[in-house]
Amino acid sequence: MYKLPDKLIDILISDDITIAEDDKSAYVELSFFSPEGQDCSLSIEKGNNIECFCNNIYDYYDNFDVSYETYLWLDSDGHGSNGAPYDMKDVYEDMEWCQNKIYDIFVIVQKYIDENKENE
């Protein structure tokens, strides 16, 4: 099973991303908190190499539906529930932040790949 490089794990951790990787699993869990305290957890398939992992992060970002994720945190009156901000707009903006953070993770991994190809 492919294992993420320790140096990449250290870079992600330094960006306040928690990583749970089981050597026997095809997936890695990436977690972070949004400005409003939303615990965001992503289950990303590692694939056979770092390029596959990077592509899978991008796919997760590209398929992240901010409106749907916002809807999940609204009550029947359109207000935040379960600890989410009261205003729908605030919940939506928090979900946008989460989507941008996922893109940031993609950029970090892509930069790691690019820098290590240059050093080969």
Question: Which residue ranges define each predicted feature?
Answer:
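Short, extreme N-terminal segment that most often corresponds to the first beta-strand
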Residues: M1-S25, E118-E120
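Amphipathic, interaction-prone secondary-structure segments
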Residues: I13-L72
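Intrinsically disordered, low-complexity regulatory regions enriched in serine/threonine/proline
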Residues: N49-E120
